[in-house]
Curated annotation (Swiss-Prot):
Keyword Ligase listed: no
Presence of keyword Transport: no
Function description: Probably involved in steroid hormones biosynthesis.
Entry's family note: Belongs to the cytochrome P450 family.
Species, as recorded: Drosophila mettleri (Fruit fly)
Name listed for the protein in its UniProt record: Cytochrome P450 4e5, mitochondrial
Record InterPro entries: Cyt_P450, Cyt_P450_CS, Cyt_P450_E_grp-I, Cyt_P450_sf, Cytochrome_P450_Monoox
EC number(s) per entry: 1.14.-.-
Coiled-coil portions: none
GO MF annotation list: heme binding; iron ion binding; monooxygenase activity; oxidoreductase activity, acting on paired donors, with incorporation or reduction of molecular oxygen
Transmembrane domains' residue ranges: none
Chain positions recorded as heme binding sites: E307, C443
Primary localization: mitochondrion
Length: 522
């Protein structure tokens, strides 16, 4: 009883202190166009109830404010969507503006302070320590494992797509990418593709991403303390336990392998010393003259389990979906496979052959333009920043709009047209196309992700003809059948047409389709 009384008495004081600190920011950011909201909620009530509605609202605001930076308020938290390439260049190249936004604090119970969420000197030291794990030579070693996992994936697809069945390609891809990150960077085999019915961690990844995204746009749920009293907390706690148990099991298995191998030989050039997986690197590393503790190892392994699995799922799934809608581009990919591999299309493509597939590279680039795996990147201003005359006030959330760049007709001509050759004929500026971010906090695993993407798509087009869920959905004009990036009126027109198999895009940390990505394989 007294606890409740104390809380009720403290709330007005806390609100006064909070508003005293936060209200001046509204004046500091006035030069940026903004959408008026209501007291206490700001624009939170306008954002929508689902991740898909939130993404659509961002695009509607972007069109409303002439495709430039704009500001919204979530409660009294200032949020600026940055879509100006000149501003993005300054922000991404900054060596001081590298703090991730405060929303990432909600990831700490799960990921701790790994590369995704850490800041300052810890981030710099850990980034330097982990970088060798994704060295060019190690990627070549990983490639054969990627081929083996792709073969298992193809076998699974043959089974579920038999009889012209419509399959959810997005759902199937989750298990492929989980196997890939475990078998390569983690050095642990879990056989998720073959044992999918017993792998509950995939659902846990999906649930946690959804939970974090919804909390971000509900001001009261941002507080860990208040969130404990929400009806969703029980699901969150169960999901968190599943994810943490899975990561700790991965670490325990690799510790056993690490100790056994180290006991057999410590000779330079041995298989063990030459081919270290991420957990091995962490177990052997020192920071400031000391070994990493158990929590630090957990943080980096859990971070790479999430980023290496979830972002690549998005990339592979949307690339497969695009194949189903664009038969001409699929034909060009197949012809390139023949040109590079000759008549031996049933064997694995080598690392060198994948590297020689230039149209495949263009296809992946264009797929990442229209469906970037990470649609937004967050930064947090720890002081006032003057960026080309625009003040970004201290304590502001910056949402770097990777996805909106791809639909900006000032950067890409006919942005709703899927046209891989655009990257051959007119290359965008270095900060007009940034699907893997740029600058000091760029994606450390981008070469790994691209190699996996190319390996899977190469094998897919050599094995199947990829078809849409229904024949009518083949693109006849080269344009994407998607609502994202469209002005409100055009989006509503397409919705009335009722294409139930068109993706309903949502930004749940990574890009997903709420209704799956459906296609057929023949």
């Amino acid at each position: 009883m007294w606890f409740i009384v104390y809380i009720l008495l403290a709330l007005p004081i806390m609100l006064f202190v909070f508003l005293s600190c936060e209200w001046p920011k509204r004046n500091d950011a006035e030069q940026i166009e903004w959408s008026s909201g209501v007291p206490f909620l700001g624009n939170a009530h306008q954002m929508g109830k689902t991740p898909a509605e939130i993404l659509n609202t961002f695009f509607e605001f972007w069109h409303k404010y002439n495709k430039d930076n704009f500001r919204i308020w979530i409660g009294y938290y200032a949020n600026i969507l940055v879509s100006n390439p000149k501003h993005l260049e300054v922000i991404m190249n900054s060596t001081t503006l590298i703090e991730k936004l405060d929303i990432y604090d909600m990831l700490h119970p799960w990921l701790g302070e790994g590369l995704l969420t850490s800041k300052g000197s810890k981030w710099h030291k850990h980034r330097k320590m982990i970088t060798p794990t994704f060295h060019f030579n190690i990627l070549q070693d990983f490639h054969q494992v990627m081929n083996e996992n792709s073969a298992k994936f193809i076998k699974r697809l043959k089974e579920v797509s038999a009889g012209d069945n419509i399959i959810d390609f997005q759902d199937e891809t989750h298990y492929l990418t989980l196997d890939a990150i475990c078998d390569t960077a983690m050095g642990v085999t879990i056989n998720a593709i073959e044992k999918r019915d017993t792998v509950d961690v995939v659902k846990a990844f999906k649930d946690m991403c959804h939970i974090i995204n919804m909390r971000a746009f509900r001001p009261l749920q941002r507080s860990d303390f208040l969130y404990r009293f929400s009806p969703e907390y029980a699901t969150y706690a169960k999901t968190l336990k599943t994810l943490k148990d899975f990561t700790n099991d991965i670490i325990a298995k690799r510790i056993k392998v690490h100790r056994t191998a180290a006991a057999k030989t410590n000779q330079e050039g041995s298989e063990f010393s030459r081919k270290k997986m991420l957990p091995d690197t962490l177990l052997s590393a020192t920071i400031d003259g000391r070994p990493l503790n158990q929590q630090e190892i957990y943080e980096e392994v859990s971070t790479f389990m999430f980023e290496g699995h979830d972002t690549t799922t998005s990339g592979v799934a949307f690339a497969g979906y695009i194949l189903s809608r664009f038969p001409e581009e699929q034909r060009k990919l197949y012809e390139e496979q023949q040109a590079v591999m000759g008549n031996e299309l049933n064997r694995d493509a080598t690392f060198q052959e994948i590297s020689a597939m230039k149209y495949l590279d263009l296809f992946i680039k264009e797929a990442q333009r229209v469906y970037p795996s990470v649609p937004f990147i967050g930064r947090y201003t720890d002081k006032d920043y003057n960026i080309h005359g625009t003040i970004m006030p201290k304590g502001t959330t910056l949402n770097l709009g990777i996805i909106v760049l791809g639909y900006d007709d000032r950067v890409f001509e006919e942005p709703h047209r899927f046209y891989p050759e655009r990257f051959e004929k007119q290359k965008p500026g270095p900060f007009e196309y940034v699907p893997f971010s740029a600058g000091p906090r760029n994606c450390i695993g981008q070469k790994f992700a691209l190699l996996e993407l190319k390996t899977v798509i190469s094998k897919l087009v050599r094995t199947f003809e990829v078809l849409p869920a229904v024949d009518e959905l083949v693109s006849k004009d080269g344009n994407l059948n998607t609502y994202v990036g469209l002005p409100k009126e055009e989006k509503e027109r397409k919705e009335r047409m009722g294409y139930k198999y068109d993706p309903i895009l949502s930004a749940v940390l990574t890009l997903k389709s709420e209704n799956g990505l459906h296609l057929r394989l023949r």
